[in-house]
């Protein structure tokens, strides 16, 4: 039938032309609420207020018809049949773009996206990477699964071309991360959960992460400075140590004992007693030595006397015999 033939021709034509992005498709995926048609109609005019648009897995072959998405921040186009990156210059506020698992062969038409920070081009057909087609605002880039990643020196070249890049192919660029007591890295995961997991997952609204990263770094620096200043202002604590007992000289026992009455007099008295006993021992030793010395002197005198008396006795004996 003629009608059936025309429908078949239109279907074939649509297949050749591919599936395009339309307002109806955007509304269906992002503004439709099943069972509440009134609400859907009310939300239709808010198309320009959308900040996150999800069009993944729709078989889309061409990018277009995005002019009304004036406030969009995040665009999900993964798992489609897109062959070219195009028609994105009209959404300059875009920060997150996922084009993973498509049929893209070249990186192009991205320089107008001056605020783009996250770009996922994994699992495509990119053989030659044109670095000058990538916006320098990128913080995270994923090219895993593309032939270009096998090129010698690929990682070094990409890092050199993108001065703000923090993560390439799910591998952090360590030299560009602030290494703070290494760390506290869980703080980053808590503050920026968007940095974890595959880019194709739903993440909700993205705030201005560049500003957040800057503020996070400032907070760390301020905390370090505060800690440093607090350490500099801390005064050393002087501990009251007990005084060592003094060893008084001979004759100072009484004065020392009377200077500090009460509890402190007891140890002083003890030390005085020890000193007195030591003095007595020395005196007794001196007395013993003097007695011994006297005995020795008497013995010497006696021996001399006996020696002197011996010749006199001899003389007396001789005199008697003569008589």
From Swiss-Prot:
Source organism (scientific name): Mus musculus
Source organism, top-level taxon: Eukaryota
Repeat region (LRR), residues: 49-70, 71-92, 93-114, 115-135
Knockout or disruption consequences: Male mice show reduced total sperm counts, impaired sperm motility, and are completely infertile. Sperm exhibit a variety of abnormal head shapes, as well as coiled, short, or absent flagella.
Phosphoserine modification, residue list: 179, 185-186, 303
One GO CC term, this protein: sperm midpiece
UniProt cross-references to PROSITE patterns, sorted A to Z: LRR
Residue numbers carrying Phosphothreonine: 178
Region span, Disordered: 249-323
The protein's name: Leucine-rich repeat-containing protein 46
Tissue: Testis-specific (at protein level).
Residue stretches making up the LRRCT domain: 146-188
Ranges annotated as biased composition (Low complexity): 267-316
Gene Ontology terms: biological process: maintenance of cell number; single fertilization; sperm axoneme assembly; sperm flagellum assembly; sperm mitochondrial sheath assembly; spermatid development; spermatogenesis
Described function: Required for normal spermatogenesis and male fertility. Plays an important role in sperm flagellum biogenesis.
Coiled-coil portions: 203-228
Keywords: Cell projection, Cilium, Coiled coil, Differentiation, Flagellum, Leucine-rich repeat, Phosphoprotein, Repeat, Spermatogenesis
Localization of this protein: Cell projection, Cilium, Flagellum
């Amino acid at each position: 039938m003629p009608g059936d033939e025309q429908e078949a021709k239109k279907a074939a034509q649509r297949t050749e032309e591919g599936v395009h992005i339309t307002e109806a498709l955007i509304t269906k995926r992002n503004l439709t609420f099943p069972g509440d048609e009134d609400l859907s109609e009310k939300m239709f005019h808010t198309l320009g207020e959308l900040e996150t648009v999800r069009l993944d897995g729709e078989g889309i072959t061409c990018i277009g018809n995005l002019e009304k998405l004036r406030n969009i921040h995040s665009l999900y186009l993964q798992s489609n049949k897109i062959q070219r990156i195009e028609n994105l210059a009209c959404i300059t506020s875009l920060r997150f773009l996922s084009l993973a698992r498509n049929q893209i062969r070249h990186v192009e038409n991205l320089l107008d996206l001056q605020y783009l920070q996250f770009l996922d081009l994994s699992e495509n057909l990119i053989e030659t990477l044109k670095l000058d087609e990538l916006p320098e605002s990128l913080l995270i880039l994923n090219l895993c699964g593309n032939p270009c990643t096998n090129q010698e020196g690929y990682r070094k070249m990409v890092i050199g071309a993108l001065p703000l890049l923090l993560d390439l192919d799910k591998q952090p660029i360590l030299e560009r991360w602030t290494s703070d007591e290494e760390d506290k890295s869980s703080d980053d995961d808590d503050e920026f959960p968007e940095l974890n997991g595959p880019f194709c997952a739903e993440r909700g609204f993205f705030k201005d992460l560049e500003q957040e990263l800057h503020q996070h770094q400032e907070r760390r620096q301020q905390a370090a400075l505060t800690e440093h200043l607090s350490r500099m202002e801390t005064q050393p604590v002087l501990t009251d140590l007990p005084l060592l007992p003094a060893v008084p000289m001979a004759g100072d026992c009484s004065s020392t004992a009377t200077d500090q009455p009460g509890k402190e007099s007891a140890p002083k008295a003890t030390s005085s007693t020890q000193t007195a006993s030591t003095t007595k021992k020395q005196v007794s030793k001196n007395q013993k030595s003097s007695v011994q010395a006297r005995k020795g002197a008497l013995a010497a005198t006696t021996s001399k006397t006996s020696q002197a008396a011996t010749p006199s006795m001899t003389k007396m004996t001789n005199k008697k015999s003569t008589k």
